Every structure is written in structure tokens, then in C-alpha cells.
Amino acid sequence: MELLAGTGLWPMAIFTVIFILLVDLMHRRQRWTSRYPPGPVPWPVLGNLLQVDLCNMPYSMYKLQNRYGDVFSLQMGWKPVVVINGLKAVQELLVTCGEDTADRPEMPIFQHIGYGHKAKGVVLAPYGPEWREQRRFSVSTLRNFGVGKKSLEQWVTDEASHLCDALTAEAGRPLDPYTLLNKAVCNVIASLIYARRFDYGDPDFIKVLKILKESMGEQTGLFPEVLNMFPVLLRIPGLADKVFPGQKTFLTMVDNLVTEHKKTWDPDQPPRDLTDAFLAEIEKAKGNPESSFNDANLRLVVNDLFGAGMVTTSITLTWALLLMILHPDVQCRVQQEIDEVIGQVRHPEMADQAHMPFTNAVIHEVQRFADIVPMNLPHKTSRDIEVQGFLIPKGTTLIPNLSSVLKDETVWEKPLRFHPEHFLDAQGNFVKHEAFMPFSAGRRACLGEPLARMELFLFFTCLLQRFSFSVPTGQPRPSDYGVFAFLLSPSPYQLCAFKR
């Protein structure tokens, strides 16, 4: 009765506050060690959550690096986080300590889309047997279906022709290039996963791309981070569907495509694509409870490959065309090299890359300047490690700040400017820099890197072979500042394509 009347509430409230503060202190205990990385003082319960701009993480990390150094700590709720900055520290973390930093932290927000036991995809899977199994399968299967080979090169070149035809239809008129670039790159991934291409005007195709674009921004910001810190909130009925509608819709589309694919799959015939190869592995794994080959994991692996192999490449190409209209002198030099090495009739080939140092340098500089994955995906320590003299305990979430490497002022001559000469020596020969790390490094380096390199070179050279690009007449010069939503995309802009 006292409790109901309110007279017993004060002792309970005091007890609850003391309990929460004790739990909070327990989670802070590692900060008391002398060799733990410095960082801003966390607030009770929330930690540094409100002291970091989650909508502009690269800038927040830049300011914190300037204040606390290349290795600093944060407390996100009760989760300890260490951010690693600069070439030397990131190399030490991902390469020297690679075996002990290849794990992933738990991210409860992904459980709502089917991540669970033996179903964690490949990108976010914990470091262990399941990850190795799926990584090995993905790399070998992509290689078998042409990644790095002439067969896929021809497919990319053919898709580039479709892209150029679509641009020809819009020649001279202002357009946002991202949509067309996204369609072209998606068709390359679709050829590997589903052995098919989509017509650019297909309404279902347009819907898939729209949903995928929307879903990419659902994973960043304050609310997803709060849900990761306090996953009990995900038990609120309907909350996940409201917070992550794009991801759930996209995965439903993936399920429908897989269901259609199963109707025509013949296990007695060689696999047509990655989906067939995965279905064959599911058949082999029947009766093996330890296998990660199952229907639930198929949808997640396909989702990972779309994200890793499509969105990043199309955004990079969108940056490339933006930088060409902002730097017409660079565009002219690339076209001059294309004319000298390839001409205007023959299709570009990967073999041409070795003879085109300036074009190669421009593509690399686009990747460095665009910096589209500034914060990388989080890692986790599987045991106590030491980085740059600081002790980082087992179980700590790690954020390798790739932006701090690609814009490292101690490494690059003009880190904040678009400067292709970063990748050229005094004689004009192409040189690759050790600080060029857009695909990350170590055991968790992007598995789609070989495919991305092929697509970037072939699409970029095909486009500049056929067209000149410029800012539309009467429109202001577009900005080269990016918009952060986990990936760093260029601010929306328009260009005009003119046939050469």
C-alpha cells in the first residue's frame, strides 16, 4: 500500500539510480588504466553519444583526432569504442594485429532482418569458421564467374555500351548521372548473382534501386545507435519495421528473386551464377548443423554482395563525373590519353590500363578524394592488443578511420584537394601509395575489390571515350562536399553529356 500510495517510491528510485551508476562505473573501469587511450569524458549511461555528431561522423572524428591524437577512446552508452587514425596506426591495427582485430561487434539492429544462428552473411559475420566458409565461397565463386577474367570484362564492356546508349538519348540535357550509373553497375552484379540483366526502364528494377538507396541511410544516425546500445527497445512491436523499412523491403525483393531462381535451377547442370552455386552448397550441407549454407544465409550473402559490389562503385563513378566537370583540364588530359592509347572506335580493355598512367592516377585520386567509406565497418578485439603504445582490452569495438588515412596530412601533398599527381612520379609514371586504402586492409579488406577496380576503369574510360561532360548552362558550380549516410555521396548535382 505504501508503494501504491507513493511513500515507498523514493527508496526504490534511489536504489535504481545507485544501481545504474554502479553499472555505469563498472563499464568505465578500463578507462582508469594508465595506458588506455584518452578521450572525452563520458556522461552517465549515455557515454559520449550526444558529444559525437552521428550524422557527420568524419568531421566529428577529425576534431577528436586533433584534440586527443591518433588513438582515442569513446564510450557509446556502455560500449567501449576506440577510434584509430592515421596511416601508421591503422596499418598496425589491421595488418600487424590483423588476427586479433578481424572480429565484428554485435549489432542487434540487424537481427530484425534475419541475422541469427548460422545466418550472418559475410560482411558482418563474426571472425571464425562461418565467416571463413562464406568469404572463401564468395571469392572463389566470383572468380569462377569471371571476376578478373576476360569473360566478365566483356560483360562490363557490353553494359557500358548500354549505359552510353542511355546517355546518348539524354545528350545535351541536364541530368543526375547517379541513376543511370547505378543501373549499369547493378546489372553487372545481377549478372554474377542471377545471370541476367534488367532493362533500364523496367519498373521493378527501378523500384529495387530506389529501395536499396533508401535502405543505406537507415543504418546511421542517433536512433540506430541507441537501438544498438539498448537492444531491448527492438522488442517494441513494429518499431523495427518503422525504423528500417527499406532494408526489410529490399530483402523481401531478394527473397522473391531467389524463389524465382529456384524454379529454374537444375542441380544436375553446372551453376549459372552465384545463386545456383549457393543452392548447390545448401544441398551438400544437408544434415550438417555446423554449415552456414542455408536459405536464411543466402539472402544475407546476396544482400552483402549488392551493398559491397554495387552501391560503392556507383557512388564512386558519380564522384568521378562530378570531379571531371569541376576540373575540365583533367577531363581533357584523360580524353587525350584515351585517344592516344585506345582511339575512339575500339572498346577499352583492362590491358590498356598499364599504358594509361594518367587515367589510372585520376581513378585512384577520385577514390582517395571521394573517401566514400570514411569510417569503415567496426571491428572488435578478440584479445588484449597494443596499438601505438596504448592498451586496448579484449571485446573493445574498433573504428578504423579510413578517412584519416586517405586525407593524412603527413602523407599526401594536397590531402584536401583533388590532385591526380598524388599517384604520378616525376616522369609521369603511375605509382600506388601505401596510404591508398579505400578498400580497407587486412583480413577484412573488401572482397569486391577486384570487381570494383575492373568496373571503375572500364566504365570511366568508356564514358570519357564517348562523351564530354560539363556543368549545365546557367547552373551554379556544384559542390565537392559529400553527404554522409555511412557512405559519403556527392551532393546531388546535374551535368550535361555531349557526344565527342
From Swiss-Prot:
Subcellular locations according to the entry: Endoplasmic reticulum membrane; Microsome membrane
Protein name (Swiss-Prot/TrEMBL): Cytochrome P450 2D3
GO biological process annotation, one example: arachidonate metabolic process
Species of the source: Rattus norvegicus
Molecular function as annotated in GO: heme binding; iron ion binding; monooxygenase activity; oxidoreductase activity, acting on paired donors, with incorporation or reduction of molecular oxygen, reduced flavin or flavoprotein as one donor, and incorporation of one atom of oxygen
Keyword hit for Hydrolase: no
Residues holding heme: 446
Obligatory cofactor(s): heme
